[in-house]
Amino acid sequence: MPAERRRALDVVAAFLRCPVCAGPVLAGDGQVRCDLGHSFNLARQGYVSLTSGQGGPGTGDSAAMVMARERFLGAGHYRPVADAIAAIAARLARGGEPGLVLDLAGGTGYYLARVLDVLQERHGACVDLSAAALRRAARAHPRAAALGADAWQRLPFADGSAALVLSVFGPRNPAEIRRVLAPGGALIIAVPGPDHQRELRGPLGLIGIDERKTARLADAFGGYPGAGVSAVRYQLRLGHADLTDLVAMGPSARHIAAGDLADRVAALPDPVTVTVDVEVRSYRELPGAARRDVHYEIIYIQT
C-alpha cells in the first residue's frame, strides 16, 4: 500500500471502534486490531472489512454493477452532481478545520473523492458492503480509507466522530448518523428528484421514484436545522452503451435480465436524451438550535 494511503488508514483508525466490543482500534501490520485482540485484516486491494464477523463483505453491488458504475461515472456524466455536493460541503465546512468525512454506502468513492478535493485538510472513509466497490474505493483518493460495513447497522465509528456525513443515492440509518455526527457537523443527502431518468422509466421498466421520499427525509431528519436544498437538473445525450451502464449500475439491474435490458435499449433512439434531477439536502447538527427556514436553490447545468 502506498505510504499516503497507509497514513489515511492510520488517521481514520483513530475514529474507528471495534465492531465486536466497541473498543478503540489501531492500524498496523496489515490489520486493524483492538486491545481485546479482535483483528480485521487489510485486504490485498487496500480495504478493511469491519463487519462483526471475520469474513469480508458478502453482499452489496455485484462486480458487474460496479464495473458499469465505474464506466458511467468515469465518463463524467454525473460530474455536475459531484461538483454540487462538493460545493455544498465547502460551504458547510468550518474554516479549514480537519476532521473525518464519512461516506455511507459510498460505492467506489467517487463522490467522497470530489469532496476531499475541495476539503483538503480532511480525511475520508468510504463505507460499503460490496467487495468489488471497496477495491476501487481504496484507490479513489490519497486521503481516503475504504471500509467494509453495513450502512443499515451500527457503524464501526465512535460517537461524534464525523465532521461531515455523505449519503448519496444509498441507504441510511438516521439513528446511526445522529450518533456518529460531531457537534456542529454537517450531513449531505442526495436523492433522485421526481424527474430523474423520467424518459427511461416506461421504455426500460425502471424502478419508479418514491413519491414520499422527501416527506420521509423530513421525518427522519426534522430535528436538524435545515441548511438548504439544491436541485441539480440537466440533460444528457446518451448512446446505447452509456444507457446500458446507467441501468446496469443501479437498483433496476436487480430486476431486469441482461437480455431483456439489451432488447429494450436497442428499441430506443441512439442517442437518447435523459434528464438528471437530483435533490441535495444539507443539514447541520446544532444541539438545542431552533429550526430554520430551508433555503432552496435550483442549479441548472447546460451540457
Model-identified regions with their sequence ranges:
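Conserved class I S-adenosyl-L-methionine
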Residues: 186-216
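Conserved alpha-helix/loop element of class I SAM-dependent methyltransferases that forms part
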Residues: 75-97
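Class I SAM-dependent methyltransferase SAM/SAH-binding core
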Residues: 100-102, 109-154
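A short acidic, Gly/Pro-enriched loop at the edge of an enzyme's catalytic core
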Residues: 153-164
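Conserved Class I S-adenosyl-L-methionine
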Residues: 12-14, 231-303
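A short glycine-rich, Lys/Arg-flanked "PGG" loop and its adjoining helix->strand segment in the class I
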Residues: 174-186
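Class I SAM-dependent methyltransferase Rossmann-like catalytic core
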Residues: 58-83
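N-terminal auxiliary segments of SAM/dcSAM-dependent transferases
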Residues: 1-59
